Amino acid sequence: MDLLIYIERGGIIVNILILMNIIGFAIMIWKSFVFFMTNRSIETLSNEILDELKLTQNYELAQIKSSISLKISSIESGLNTIKIIASLSPLIGLLGTVIGILNSFDSISHLGLGDPTVFSSGISIALITTVAGLIVAIPHYIGYNYFIGSLDKIEIKLEKVILDKI
């Protein structure tokens, strides 16, 4: 079957999943750029944090970690959206599954079991939405975990560079 036919048969559920996928991938592309630039500017970030610490004359480890956390939180923005897409898309696909099966049983109750295509049409929609939900969820789940791992590495690098400078 052609992809466009699957999208058409999946209805509003597949269209919602496509929109979520576009939004999620746009955020992941944006975050890839942000993480790339952040990794290249660890020295600059560490100097900014050290300048802030110099103003307060507070070089305690807790204050250093707090300042790093503030910088990291700005880099982290947008990752929750990726996590939400990874979590919600299988559920939305499951909603489509339930709707498809409901349509199948509704068709049977109106037309009987004489024509198997009536029943199979609803089941087909159910499976299309399930697959679409998983297709959206899996790369976003992988992307989210990759970014969280990268964020941890950036935080460790920042901490090391700052502690080396003090």
Question: How would you label these PLM feature ranges?
Answer:
Residues M1-E48, E52, S73-E155, K160:
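Hydrophobic alpha-helical transmembrane segments of small proteolipidic membrane proteins, enriched
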